[in-house]
């Protein structure tokens, strides 16, 4: 990662300074971007599972963050038994404070360090652990319905009206927080062949959604409303001043639309999980792709604003190719990272590698943004364009605030969720996903107000006569040099015998008249010094000076 950060300079345009003056925040931000893992949006937790268990299967292990008084329902939907079999089904509900505690249970079962007959509550230290057992459950080939599973203690504390609805409830949580639910199925006849299709559901006060995902669902709903308000506000401004809309304002409209679409799709996915308990993988992948496009376009928007596109420069030239290439690179890796996280989980190797690459690309974005912004502000200061300079000064202050907020937040998340031995702050986990969307929404509203359509919109537009770009200045110089060469040839005329005719005052007047008629006034300032420096003109000037000096003596 360090080598990747050091190689960033080779990918950018050459400058005398790699960083703008007085930019310690940029160095700190780049270091944190290289060393801190990228923020990973967690896949929402399910609320309904359908599992197949046979005579060779081990215990079923389920993990979820649940509210207090969440009902856990367990039932056998279908079964197949080759002969008469008596089942003993035992389930254990364990509450634990640390989210990363007991994360290796599946590995222990695979290595046979834990057996099916193990007392899991004893292994899990018995604290906040409840065990329930249903014995002598008959199953044979003639059975039509598998015996229902229940917890007598829970049935006794329910009233009669809710008793029928609660027959499948096998456990109920006593606290808000992380829980592990383990189901162990044993038979007396170990040689019997059998197959069970088990259904498990966890329904809390807000439906199937987990306690850690419920605040995130509310956040996406609020942000969707916020982006709708952004869109209405921007459309209103654009409709009032549609004749003066700048090119940069179309980019802002596209970012607002994609942000609204992204939040709407994520909210619908979380709402679907809350209602059904199941996640629609296709909808989740679509949401991740929309998010990747929106994040890419948002970064490109900040870069082209920093470069002064449409404000200081009419076009970006070859720099635009680098910006688009960097954006496409980010889009590809962001899309792959999102899809692989949905399919393979957050710990998949491809996800980890993509996170590292995205961190490096983000550091390049930060580098590019600050260098371009410093160059744009320097140009505006030299041109003494106070209106545009004030605009970019406010934008710079917004980016500095975003960098400071990112540094503080990355330090907090690293301490709380990544290096902590006991990850107990489950109520704040949604902030790890929501912060970056909220921070960009603040940057976007600042950009909207700074570049909003208005009656004075053209104050911020590029003016060819005032805001000439560097490329046009170079083209002007080349054209001027070509013109002066022609003027030098015009200064000495040949006669028929091949000898040069010396310049006289009449020739000088003719040359001056030709210059005034054929060369624009903006070019004479560059062309005239070359004309004056010719030998003939030096002689003419000296003769005129002598005449004027002699006339003064006579007077």
Curated annotation (Swiss-Prot):
The modification Phosphoserine is found at residues 469, 494, 496, 534. It comes from the Eukaryota. Residues 43-214, 269-299, 344-350, 418-429 are lumenal. Residues 236-247, 321-322, 372-396, 451-555 are cytoplasmic. Residues 1-42 form the signal peptide. It is a multi-pass membrane protein. Glycans are attached at residues 68, 197, 272. InterPro entries: GOST_TM, GPR107/GPR108-like, TMEM87A/B_GOLD. It is found in: Golgi apparatus membrane. The chain crosses the membrane at residues 215-235, 248-268, 300-320, 323-343, 351-371, 397-417, 430-450. Keywords: Glycoprotein, Golgi apparatus, Membrane, Phosphoprotein, Signal, Transmembrane, Transmembrane helix. One of its GO terms (biological process) is retrograde transport, endosome to Golgi. GO terms for cellular component: cytosol; Golgi apparatus; Golgi cisterna membrane; Golgi membrane. Belongs to the LU7TM family. TMEM87 subfamily. May be involved in retrograde transport from endosomes to the trans-Golgi network (TGN). It is linked to TMEM87B mutations may be involved in restrictive cardiomyopathy (RCM), a rare non-ischemic myocardial disease. RCM is characterized by restrictive ventricular-filling physiology in the presence of normal or reduced diastolic and/or systolic volumes (of 1 or both ventricles), biatrial enlargement, and normal ventricular wall thickness. This is Transmembrane protein 87B. It comes from Homo sapiens (Human). The gene is TMEM87B.
């Amino acid at each position: 990662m360090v080598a990747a950060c050091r190689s960033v300079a080779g990918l950018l345009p050459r400058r005398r300074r790699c960083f703008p003056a007085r930019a310690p925040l940029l160095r700190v931000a780049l270091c944190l971007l290289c060393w801190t893992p990228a923020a990973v949006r967690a896949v929402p937790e399910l609320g309904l599972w359908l599992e197949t268990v046979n005579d060779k299967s081990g215990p079923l292990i389920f993990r979820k963050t649940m509210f207090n008084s969440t009902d856990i329902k367990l039932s056998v939907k279908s079964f197949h038994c080759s002969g008469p079999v008596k089942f003993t089904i035992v389930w254990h509900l364990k509450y634990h404070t640390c989210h990363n505690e007991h994360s290796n249970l599946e590995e222990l079962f695979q290595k046979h360090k834990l057996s099916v007959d193990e007392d899991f509550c004893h292994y899990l230290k018995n604290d906040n652990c409840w065990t329930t057992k249903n014995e002598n459950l008959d199953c044979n080939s003639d059975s039509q319905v598998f015996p229902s599973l229940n917890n007598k203690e829970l049935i006794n504390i329910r009233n009669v009206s809710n008793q029928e609805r609660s027959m499948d409830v096998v456990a109920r949580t006593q606290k808000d927080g992380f829980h592990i639910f383990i189901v162990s199925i044993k038979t007396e006849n170990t040689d019997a062949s059998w197959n069970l299709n088990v259904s498990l559901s966890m329904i809390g006060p807000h439906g199937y959604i987990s306690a850690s995902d419920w605040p995130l669902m509310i956040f996406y709903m609020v942000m969707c409303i916020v982006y709708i308000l952004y869109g209405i506000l921007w459309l209103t401004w654009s409709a009032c001043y549609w004749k003066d809309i700048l090119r940069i304002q179309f980019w802002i409209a596209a970012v607002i639309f994609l942000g609204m679409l992204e939040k709407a799709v994520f909210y619908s996915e979380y709402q679907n999980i809350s209602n059904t308990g199941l996640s629609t993988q296709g909808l989740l992948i679509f949401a991740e792709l929309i998010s990747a496009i929106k994040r890419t376009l948002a970064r490109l928007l900040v870069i082209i604003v920093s470069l002064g596109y449409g404000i200081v420069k009419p076009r970006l030239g070859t720099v635009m190719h680098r910006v688009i290439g960097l954006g496409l690179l980010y889009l590809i890796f962001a899309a792959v990272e999102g899809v692989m996280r949905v399919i393979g989980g957050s710990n998949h190797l491809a996800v980890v590698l993509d996170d590292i690459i995205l961190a490096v690309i983000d550091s390049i974005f930060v580098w590019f943004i600050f260098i371009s912004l410093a160059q744009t502000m320097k140009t505006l200061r030299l041109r003494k364009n106070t209106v545009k300079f004030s605009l970019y000064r406010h934008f710079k202050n917004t980016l500095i605030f975003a960098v400071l907020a990112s540094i503080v937040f990355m330090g907090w998340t690293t301490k709380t969720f990544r290096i902590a031995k006991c990850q107990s702050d489950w109520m704040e986990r949604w902030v790890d996903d929501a912060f970056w969307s909220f921070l960009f929404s603040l940057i976007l509203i600042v950009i909207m107000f700074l570049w909003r359509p208005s009656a004075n919109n053209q104050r911020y537009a590029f003016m060819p006569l005032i805001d000439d770009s560097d490329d046009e200045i170079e083209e002007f110089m080349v054209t001027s040099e070509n013109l002066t060469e022609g003027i030098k040839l015009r200064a000495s005329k040949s006669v028929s015998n091949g000898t040069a005719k010396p310049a006289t005052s009449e020739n000088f007047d003719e040359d001056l008249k030709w210059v005034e008629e054929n060369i624009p006034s903006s070019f004479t300032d560059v062309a005239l010094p070359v004309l004056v420096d010719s030998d003939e003109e030096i002689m003419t000037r000296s003769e005129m000076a002598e005449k004027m000096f002699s006339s003064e003596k006579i007077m």
